[in-house]
Amino acid sequence: MRTVRYILTATFLFIAVCVEAQQLRKEAFALLNLEQPALEKVKAACARQHWDEAAQALLDYYRHRNGVVHPDLDLQNIKISKEEQKWADDALGHTFFVHKGYQPSYNYGKDINWEYWPVQDNELRWQLHRHKWFTPMGKAYRLSGDEKYAKEWAYQYIDWIEKNPLTEVEPEEYELVSAGEVKGDAENVRFAWRPLEVSNRLQDQTLQFLLFVNSPSFTPAFLTEFLVNYHRHALHILNNYSAQGNHLLFEAQRIVYAGAFFPEFKEAASWRESGINILNREIKKQVYTDGGHYELDPHYHLAAINIFCKALRMADVNGFRQEFPAGYVGTVKHMIEFYSNVCFPDYSNPCFSDAKLGNRSAEVGNYQDWLKIFPDCEWIRYYATEGREGSPLSYLSHGALDSGFFTFRNGWKQDATVMVVKAGPKGEWHCQPDNGTFELWFNGRNLFPDSGSYVYAGDDEVMKLRNWFRQTSVHNTLTLDEKNLQTTESVTRLWQPEGNEQILVTENPHYEDLKHRRSVFFVDQAYFVIVDEAVGNAR
């Protein structure tokens, strides 16, 4: 026991020394607009080149700052789950929660090896640099008052900066989806500094800032390190936005967060403007008129909703909602309605394409967040309160003909019968060759779950598993000799969502010389008849 205590004590002393040894970064002050009245003490100290005094004044300012509100954190009502507490505690010994698919979590060594890659899955390497355990460490610190969490967080934060310098790589190298093509320093940069991961840190470090700023370990010198690093992150996003898709949405929303949460930066207003302009543009490009997102994946549809809503919430609480047009807000609500229609009574969504199942508490939490934006919407209130308040959508069956999602439904409660069919156009990267597939919910159970997805990319072994989950033959649709679909462009021939015999007829040119026509009949809102026709001369 004495040996263990000695090791722990030595470890924390080592961490404390590392934190205290950080050099004050006086260039941080040049990044800020010191003309703001609240920063007059900082400005005066800088004018005298009293950098320690300036850093202390700046830290005092941030510890007492008013006027900036964070919609994702109430410091008076912090809650930590058992899972988050475990992440925080494990992180003290450098066992980092990185990916749910790889449990138990890996240990990255006493001298943290940020390049450790135990399984050649790109997501494992990318997601390490999202630092998912940092915010739980902050919650654990605020709730317990135990300085060990703050000391270790500050140590890991600086350690990451020192071991992951930003150097130039080709933009396309950030998005390579298999292992081993990029060598040397560039290999680590493409993982640590991929714009999506950078944006993730940009967002989450606003929370960590609030949780740790009052800690003795959050020193004036550390503050200058933090601000310089944060500014570097923001500029990297602005200069390396992804070309399209959900990555671009995440990056834009998070640059809005950066500009709103740190208005002291000279470029803060332009950061916010950049993000809002992209979101306003992309919501028109990425969302069909029926409210479906063009990935044609329920999980990424949900992610897009939350991206658009997070930006709105940040705007609401900080007084710039007017920068989003009414059409933007209306589209977000339409997307929520779409999502409500494709989900089952237990709040789970079909695992079409790369979708993940989700869990009830998180889904209810989504509706609760959405209700803050749409407080007068009775059907959002219904799902936010698990049916205790409000009223459900006024119809049952629903068709989204542009994106190709069709729901037969006889109720909204647990004992309902629900079928969701996916039969739409060619989707984006996360969409799978599964046109005509369906899931069926009956009396509290999903009787026909879709295959879902594996991890996204990695070495040959990882890709073998990835491709197994993607293949058409593991979906609930017709195949020829178990080959993947050659074409995914379904056409709706008939959609009749009312009456005692509700009908969907959809066609897709699955293969050369073979068209698949699937007709679904929902009879008396009680049972289904599915008729499959293979039309053509294919052999």
Where in this protein do the model-derived segments appear?
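Short, solvent-exposed loop/edge-beta patches enriched in aromatic
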Residues: 51, 66-70, 80-92, 96-102, ...
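Non-catalytic C-terminal accessory modules of carbohydrate-active enzymes
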Residues: 392-539
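Extreme N-terminal leader/anchor segments
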Residues: 22-99
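Short secondary-structure junctions and interdomain/linker hinges
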Residues: 53, 65, 69, 160-163, ...
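Aromatic-lined, polymer-binding surfaces characteristic
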Residues: 105-110, 114-115, 120-333
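Bacterial Sec-dependent N-terminal signal peptides
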Residues: 1-23
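Sequence-level motif detector for i,i+2 pairs with an aromatic at +2
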Residues: 70, 75, 80-95, 99-103, ...
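Carbohydrate-active enzyme catalytic cores, enriched for enzymes
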Residues: 288-448, 497-499, 504-505
